[in-house]
Swiss-Prot record:
Zn(2+) binds at C267, C272, H274, C280. The keyword Transmembrane does not apply. CDD domains: S1_YloQ_GTPase, YjeQ_EngC. InterPro entries: G_CP_dom, NA-bd_OB-fold, P-loop_NTPase, Ribosome_biogen_GTPase_RsgA, RsgA_GTPase_dom, RsgA_N. Residues 79-243 form the CP-type G domain. This is Small ribosomal subunit biogenesis GTPase RsgA. It holds the Pfam family RsgA_N. Gene3D superfamilies: Nucleic acid-binding proteins, P-loop containing nucleotide triphosphate hydrolases, Probable gtpase engc, domain 3. GTP binds at N128, K129, I130, D131, G182, H183, S184, G185, V186, G187, K188, S189, S190. Belongs to the TRAFAC class YlqF/YawG GTPase family. RsgA subfamily. One of its GO terms (biological process) is ribosomal small subunit biogenesis.
Length: 315
């Protein structure tokens, strides 16, 4: 029997079967996809083959994961070689950002975008809490949005409290399975409650000591839109503190920054790292202001990760 994983509680997975029934299943201990060392071998959005519970008391279990069309993955922790898969078989991903309380840095945004580029997942940047922004915050919002829209990433300015911008965002999600990600405290749960009122997700407050969010979502789950086209759904995920990248070779990183990749076609050397080489078209574009400095800094940060990974000993 086949189905789609719609919830991951850590020990069990809720699977919606092709006949519409929903079953909690265990994952077999040897269930792994080739070439992926993951803390969660099964993720929400996975298409799976399951074996129903038997009459002798054996619980239902996931027998096989069907090949994934794509997925979003991050390093499980800074010192880990294992990964954590946020969601699979996605039509889009929404990264929820805030200018303040908490601050979403451009490095965090760019690491998420680069990973999504690597796995061919289109991203929409959603800047939430615009009802709370000062004039200075709004100027910063406009500057950031200009950088990302110029590259090709749609940017939505919304308020989960007032509803501003939500109709436009909702239209972008119609007919899509969309992953929702971001730091704790950016208002993901409030945003889902505003978009899908029946979701009734718990929301949390901001830690005033650290200006970071406190986790309210503790597991990933798929939530259907009742008023959009069939197949329209969000995958809600727990808040992420950092975004460590994986599986990017030193000479591949630039491929996942569209504007850097476009400029790199003019480089003198095919193995240019765009850091110091003579005849580097990327550095020239950076000097001319055609590549945002913040984006180049993010590129360097991922490049440093990959160089450090090469010299990390096996344990």
């Amino acid at each position: 029997m086949d189905g789609v994983v719609i919830k991951n509680t850590g020990s069990q997975y809720l699977v919606r079967c092709t006949d519409g029934t929903e079953l909690y299943c265990m994952a077999k201990g040897n269930l792994r996809l080739k070439g992926i060392r993951s803390t969660n071998p099964v993720t929400v959005g996975d298409r799976v083959e399951i074996v129903p519970a038997s009459q002798d008391g054996q619980p239902a279990y996931i027998k096989r994961i069907h090949p994934r069309r794509n997925y979003i993955i991050r390093r499980a922790s800074n010192l880990s070689k294992e990964s954590h898969i946020l969601g699979a078989n996605l039509d889009a991903a929404v990264l929820v950002c805030t200018i303040n309380d908490p601050v979403t840095t451009t490095v965090f945004i760019d690491r998420f975008l680069a990973t999504a580029e690597a796995y061919r997942v289109p991203v929409i940047l959603v800047f939430n809490k615009i009802d709370c922004y000062t004039q200075e915050d709004r100027l910063q919002l406009d500057r950031l949005s200009a950088v990302y829209t110029a590259i090709g990433y749609p940017c939505c300015h919304v308020s989960a409290i007032t509803g501003e911008g939500l109709p436009d965002l909702k239209s972008l999600l119609d007919g899509k399975l969309t992953l929702l990600a971001g730091h704790s405290g950016v208002g993901k749960s409030s945003l889902i409650n505003a978009l899908i009122p029946h979701a009734d997700l718990r929301t949390g407050a901001i830690s005033q000591a650290h200006h970071t969010g406190m986790h309210t979502t503790t597991f990933s789950q798929m939530i259907d839109f009742p008023d959009l086209s069939p197949g329209s759904a969000l995958i809600d995920t727990p808040g992420i503190k950092g975004f460590g990248t994986l599986e990017m070779g030193e000479y591949e990183v630039s491929h996942y920054f569209p504007e850097i990749f476009a400029a790199s076609k003019g480089c003198r050397f095919g193995n240019c790292t765009h850091t110091h080489e003579p005849g580097c078209a990327v550095l020239e574009a950076l000097r001319r202001g055609e590549i945002a400095e913040s984006r180049y800094i993010s590129y360097l940060s991922i490049l440093e990760d990959e160089n450090a990974e090469r010299y990390r000993p096996e344990y």
